[in-house]
């Protein structure tokens, strides 16, 4: 299927990182690095993307800066082009080391904003954090709506405000949890 996917014309394929690393080791008893190299061999025309938990790398606890830097270096050396870096609380301090490491390795450092609802999460909040992300050196921003909370008209407002505030590309990643993802994508464009 990789050969067919590579011909579609996707900007990138998120095929590694996050839970896939853990699942390869724990459940499939496979080497996740070997799996990544196989993806790289198969995707000749499509960028490979990974999900990276900031200072937690792919794990569930924080790691030292030198470990983060080395993991990014090895990820790029084994085929990753785009590193989608996030912190579930949008704490940018947990993203800085990974962004610097990705830039040092000439990979695209994409920061994923963990979208959520609540009184604190105003349009001004999202604009401010997007500006700080751009200043940090990220190459792009992804609005990561992992719970499917972003509604269509809110997507129009949010994407519009971010496009006005920053010069780097903006992507949207949403889940179909609430059944409105297709309309959210439509209104975000």
What are these regions (language model features)?
Residues 151-170:
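Active-site/ligand-binding-proximal alpha/beta "capping" segment
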Residues 4-9:
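A short, Lys/Arg-enriched amphipathic alpha-helix followed by its capping loop at the start of a domain
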Residues 31, 158-159, 189:
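Short secondary-structure boundary/capping segments
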Residues 3, 73, 100, 131, ...:
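Alpha-helical segments flanking ligand/cofactor-binding loops in enzyme cores
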Residues 1-2, 18:
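ATP-dependent carboxylate/acyl-activation modules
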Residues 170-179:
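Histidine-centered catalytic micro-motifs
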Residues 124-129, 133, 178-189:
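Catalytic cores of alpha/beta
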């Amino acid at each position: 299927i990789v050969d067919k996917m590579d011909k579609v014309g996707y900007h990138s394929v998120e095929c590694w990182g996050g839970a896939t690393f853990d699942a390869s080791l724990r459940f499939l008893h496979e080497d996740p690095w070997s799996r990544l190299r196989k993806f790289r061999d198969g995707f000749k025309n499509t960028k490979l993307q990974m999900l990276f938990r900031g200072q937690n790398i792919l794990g569930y606890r924080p790691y030292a800066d030198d470990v983060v830097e080395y993991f990014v270096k090895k990820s790029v050396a084994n085929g990753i082009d785009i590193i989608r870096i996030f912190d579930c609380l949008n704490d940018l301090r947990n993203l800085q080391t990974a962004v610097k490491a990705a830039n040092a390795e000439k990979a695209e450092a994409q920061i994923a904003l963990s979208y959520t609802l609540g009184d604190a999460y105003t349009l001004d909040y999202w604009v401010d954090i997007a500006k700080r992300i751009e200043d940090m050196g990220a190459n792009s921003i992804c609005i990561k709506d992992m719970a499917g909370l972003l509604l269509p008209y809110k997507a129009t407002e949010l994407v519009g405000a971010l496009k006005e505030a920053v010069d780097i590309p903006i992507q949207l990643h949403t889940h179909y949890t609430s059944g409105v993802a297709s309309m959210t994508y439509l209104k975000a464009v």
